[in-house]
């Protein structure tokens, strides 16, 4: 495996991150110098990183019980705990079943410390609500199609749930140690999985305004308030894109971190990276060798039918379309989704360099078929499911 890809996956690994930050002793867990005593610990792990996060504690704790909720299709057994498959990104009956099992566990089991392991995807994987499933599904479908931002959609979702927006804490009979692997650009931890154990600053009135804005005011009657203060959960960020980029900075040549919050059109981001390479000598004062690092979640706007593609594939095609090749420099661009899946493909991302030539590139750009093109030239990255997600990582080496 290519060294850069290997390092990205290693630096994104929740098990390794936990091992660096968490000390487990016979009767206490220590996180960044904070001590959490226990005699009967329990685990609830939910999200794309739940398997590796749970495995760390299962390996380290002699006696532990709990639930681990994974995306459907990524099932893998674990000792000592029950593993539940649910759906992502859509809420389904499996989401409600998972949420119900979590509440039953919290109410009925005997534990004196709840270790809550949270990562991206949890919002869909686990739900518990007074709103009937069919109605909640209808609301979610309409929200997704409404043109609202992800933040606006999540505000509404929190106010329709009995466990999002800090409300899961109401069901725990013991202190909660929340450890978080974040996929949210910008660092808002309450947005990870809709923050089941974190306080939320948004209000019912905020959610009403959002629903009215897109003609869904009829659903306002289902809104409930989120928790503004949480006193029984202690929350720690264990891993995110900024941590990964800082570690990459230590191993590459002359690193420059562009941003950890890349958003907007994926193709345009690739075009912008090409522009940096094209003008680095005259405009930016950059001289090879240097390495540009970035992370985030650019998007792809689909109109009509699309082929096999994803945001990272589009970044690579945008870059290849516009980068100027000459004998003065060489380049290599890595674009990888740390969860192992980019778009509707089986690939995590792609690697392209000055020798990568895609014939008829405009066709693949406009048909959103980036991986059909990149497969043909052997520039795809296939990792399989990685059991983590800190979003997308971009590394551009210029030599």
UniProtKB/Swiss-Prot annotation:
Keyword Transferase in record: yes
SUPFAM superfamilies assigned: GckA/TtuD-like (SSF82544)
Residues that bind substrate: 48
InterPro entries: GK-like_C_sf, GK_N_sf, Glycerate_kinase-1, MOFRL, MOFRL_assoc_dom, MOFRL_protein
EC number: 2.7.1.165
Catalytic function, reaction form: (R)-glycerate + ATP = (2R)-2-phosphoglycerate + ADP + H(+)
pH dependence of function: Optimum pH is 4.5. More than 70% of the optimum activity remains at pH between 3 and 7.
Cofactor note text: Magnesium. It could be replaced to some extent by nickel, manganese, cobalt, calcium, zinc or strontium.
Keywords: ATP-binding, Kinase, Nucleotide-binding, Transferase
GO molecular function: ATP binding; glycerate 2-kinase activity; glycerate kinase activity
Keyword rRNA-binding: no
Temperature-related behavior of activity: Optimum temperature is 90 degrees Celsius. It exhibits more than half of the maximum activity at temperatures ranging from 70 to 100 degrees Celsius.
Required cofactor(s): Mg(2+); Ni(2+); Mn(2+); Co(2+)
Protein task: Catalyzes the ATP-dependent phosphorylation of D-glycerate to 2-phosphoglycerate. It can also utilize GTP, CTP, UTP, ADP, AMP or pyrophosphate as phosphate donor.
Subunit text: Homodimer.
Protein name listed in UniProt: Glycerate 2-kinase
């Amino acid at each position: 495996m290519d060294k850069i890809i290997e390092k990205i996956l290693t630096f994104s690994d929740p098990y390794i991150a936990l091992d660096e930050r968490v000390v487990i002793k016979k009767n206490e867990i220590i996180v960044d110098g904070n001590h959490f005593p226990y005699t009967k610990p329990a685990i609830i792990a939910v999200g794309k990183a739940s398997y590796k996060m749970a495995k760390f504690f299962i390996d380290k704790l002699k006696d532990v019980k709990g639930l681990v909720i994974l995306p459907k299709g990524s099932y893998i057994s674990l000792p000592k705990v029950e593993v539940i498959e649910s759906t992502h990104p859509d809420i389904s009956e499996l989401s409600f079943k998972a949420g119900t099992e979590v509440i039953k566990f919290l109410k009925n089991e005997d534990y004196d410390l709840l270790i809550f392991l949270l990562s991206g995807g949890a919002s869909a994987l686990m739900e518990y609500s007074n709103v009937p499933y069919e109605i909640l599904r209808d609301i979610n479908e309409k929200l997704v199609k409404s043109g609202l931002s992800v933040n606006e959609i999540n505000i509404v979702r929190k106010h329709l749930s009995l466990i999002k927006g800090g409300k899961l804490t109401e069901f725990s009979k013991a202190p909660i140690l929340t450890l978080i692997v974040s996929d949210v650009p910008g660092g808002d931890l309450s947005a990870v999985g809709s923050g089941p154990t974190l306080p939320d600053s948004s209000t019912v009135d905020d959610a009403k305004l959002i629903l009215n804005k897109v003609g869904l005011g009829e659903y306002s009657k289902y809104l409930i308030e989120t928790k503004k203060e949480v006193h029984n959960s202690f929350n720690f960020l264990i891993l995110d894109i900024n941590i990964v980029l800082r570690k990459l900075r230590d191993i590459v040549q002359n690193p420059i971190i562009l941003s950890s919050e890349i958003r907007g059109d994926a193709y345009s981001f690739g075009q912008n990276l090409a522009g940096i390479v094209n003008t680095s000598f005259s405009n930016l004062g950059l001289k090879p060798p240097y390495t540009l690092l970035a992370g985030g979640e650019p998007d792809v706007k689909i109109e009509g039918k699309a082929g096999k593609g994803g945001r990272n594939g589009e970044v690579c095609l945008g870059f290849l379309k516009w980068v100027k090749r000459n004998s003065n420099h060489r380049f290599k661009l890595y674009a990888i989704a740390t969860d192992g899946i980019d778009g509707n493909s089986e690939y995590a991302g792609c690697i392209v360099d000055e020798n990568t030539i895609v014939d008829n590139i405009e066709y693949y750009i406009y048909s959103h078929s980036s991986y059909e093109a990149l497969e043909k030239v052997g520039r795809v990255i296939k990792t399989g499911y990685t059991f983590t997600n800190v979003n997308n990582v971009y590394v551009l080496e210029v030599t």
